[in-house]
Curated annotation (Swiss-Prot):
Pathway assigned in UniProt: Antibiotic biosynthesis
Function: Involved in the biosynthesis of one of the two 2,6-deoxysugars, dTDP-L-oleandrose, attached to the macrolactone ring oleandolide to produce the aglycone antibiotic oleandomycin. The product of the reaction, dTDP-2,6-dideoxy-D-glycero-hex-2-enos-4-ulose, is a highly unstable diketosugar, which spontaneously forms dTDP-3,4-didehydro-2,6-dideoxy-alpha-D-glucose.
GO molecular function: lyase activity
Top-level class of the enzyme under EC nomenclature: lyase
GO biological process: antibiotic biosynthetic process
Gene this protein is translated from: oleV
Residues involved in dTDP-4-dehydro-6-deoxy-alpha-D-glucose 2 binding: 176, 296, 359, 375-377, 380-381
Record keywords, A-Z: Antibiotic biosynthesis, Lyase
Protein family (similarity comment): Belongs to the hexose 2,3-dehydratase family.
InterPro entries the record matches: EvaA-like, EvaA-like_sf
Organism of provenance: Streptomyces antibioticus
Protein name, entry field: dTDP-4-dehydro-6-deoxy-alpha-D-glucopyranose 2,3-dehydratase
Record-listed E.C. numbers: 4.2.1.159
Subunit structure: Homodimer.
């Protein structure tokens, strides 16, 4: 056990079975292409008045569903002492329901496999992406939409007798766009054979991680659940051989229990507690119409900032061939420009460490969470005074290409965001990169980050995505 986390060898035994259900990556991609042809999704931008079941409240201007479920677009007033201007109002997604993001896993011939879903979301870049086995809000799996049920939900809602729970933790989502949003991230090992639907397929854990080297293929929800998994040992419980590539070997070593860390876990937790205690973050829900005081404007087609920055809220009408319901309409939040999420790494005492930032975001539940070294939308900082630019932003943007170990565009959640993407980057810093860092930064090994990921609200969603991505290199 490591700080309450069972090693994978303790959590899972080998489950050898016939390998007929398990195919090579090539066959997997052929299946995915077939699902792309079969699963059509048509998304049309429409004025707000054409959003069926949605309306602006006469008193507050809030955009909400007539059922009172799903989510709403409201206003949020924020005051903080950790931003270049300390108070503002903004639109924000309010979705108090806790959804389920669940991966079903099983061993075939001793190799751990993951059951993924080929799923199209209205905001996806490139259409269909790989989702967890279950990706559903409470409104969806309680069938508020009066559509079909959620396949394999029973493994996560009532796992006893069906599966063994390996990970089960509430995690935050994008704090700049959601207010106090959390989802239940679960990994369940199936105990018996699992009947397959056409839109679901087994892929090895290693194969799925390698697909993270491709842009816009493994969706955000799959990445966050993957980040909760410890490294998978060889079927006999021994650690697999270290990779030959130097950085891959460094990642593998940093993931191991015996890796020497610069700070103890107690010191890391004390640091984050101190950051949360000394920073101000005051949040107040206000009518959406009050965001006008901070420059937000609404017309028939969008809610947008007068300067064209940050994001817009738009309406879409959707027709789908393979979803619980065949058509619907909804608002989506559309960011302005791509984001950047970067890990700066370096070896300390011979062990790879990641530089994490205690980052405050408008909608987070408990104040700062551990975020990537750099997390921002660079376009939003083009007119910001130099002293308020994110620390290490210029270092990452000017990094020697020979020191960039991962650099891929990945999509964010397509059910609430329209074409939201981040450039995910891992930089291996030079040996003379300072070990001494500003007060709101700390060096952690990957093993320490994985330990934190089995507890709620420590590591934010962008950092969790990067944890999944960096393991694709090991």
């Amino acid at each position: 056990m490591i700080w309450g986390i069972p090693a994978m060898s303790e959590a899972m035994g080998s489950v050898p079975t016939a390998g007929s259900e398990v195919s090579s990556t090539c066959a997997f991609l052929s299946w995915l292409d077939a699902r792309r042809r079969a699963n059509r999704l048509t998304v049309e931008h429409v004025p707000f008045r054409e959003l069926s079941g949605w309306q602006f409240d006469e008193n507050t201007g809030n955009l909400r569903h007539t059922s009172g479920r799903f989510f709403s677009i409201e206003g949020l007033r924020v005051r903080t002492d950790h931003c270049w201007f300390g108070s503002w109002t903004q639109p924000i997604i309010v979705q108090p329901e806790i959804g389920i993001l669940g991966l079903l896993v099983k061993r075939f011939d001793g190799i751990l496999h993951v059951l993924v879903q080929a799923k199209n979301e209205p905001g996806n870049i490139g259409g269909l992406q790989l989702s967890p086995t279950v990706q559903a809000t409470r409104s969806n799996y309680t069938r508020v939409h009066r559509g079909g049920g959620v396949r394999y939900l029973e493994y996560f809602a009532s796992p006893r007798g069906r599966g063994r729970v390996l990970a089960d933790v509430l995690q935050s989502e994008q704090g700049s766009w959601f207010l106090h949003k959390r989802n239940r991230n679960m990994v369940v090992e199936a105990l018996d054979d699992v009947p397959l639907d056409d839109d679901f397929h087994w892929i090895s854990l290693g194969g799925l991680r390698k697909l993270l080297l491709r842009p816009h293929l493994v969706n955000m929800d799959t990445r966050t659940v993957l980040s909760c998994l410890p490294p998978d040992p060889a079927p006999d419980g021994r650690q697999p051989p270290a990779p030959a590539a130097p950085f891959a070997a460094a990642v593998t070593r940093s993931l191991t229990r015996g890796a020497t860390a610069l700070h103890t876990m107690g010191e890391i937790l004390g640091w984050l507690t101190d950051e949360r205690s000394r920073r101000e973050l005051v949040q107040q829900r206000v009518p959406l119409e009050e965001t006008a005081f901070s420059g937000w404007r609404r017309d028939d087609h969008a809610i947008a900032h007068k300067d064209g920055d940050y994001f817009r809220v738009i309406g879409v009408s959707v027709r789908a061939s393979s979803r619980e319901v065949s058509s619907w309409s909804q608002p989506l939040l559309a960011p302005v420009g791509p984001g950047l999420a970067a890990f700066v790494t370096r070896r300390i005492r011979g062990v790879l460490h990641v530089l994490l930032h205690a980052r405050t975001e408008a909608g987070l539940l408990n104040g700062p969470e551990m975020a990537p070294t750099v997390q921002c939308r660079p376009l939003n900082y083009r007119a910001v005074p130099a002293e308020y630019r994110p620390a290490y932003l210029d270092y990452v943007l000017s990094a020697d290409p020979g020191r960039i170990r991962y650099d891929t565009l990945q999509s964010e959640e397509g059910g609430r965001f329209h074409h939201a993407e981040n450039r995910y980057v891992v930089v291996e810093a030079e040996d003379d990169f300072p070990v001494e860092v500003p007060r709101d930064f700390r060096w952690l090994t990957l093993h320490q980050i994985l330990a934190l990921l089995h507890h709620s609200n420590y590591v934010n969603v962008e950092a969790r995505s990067l944890v999944a991505c960096i393991q694709a290199l090991s």
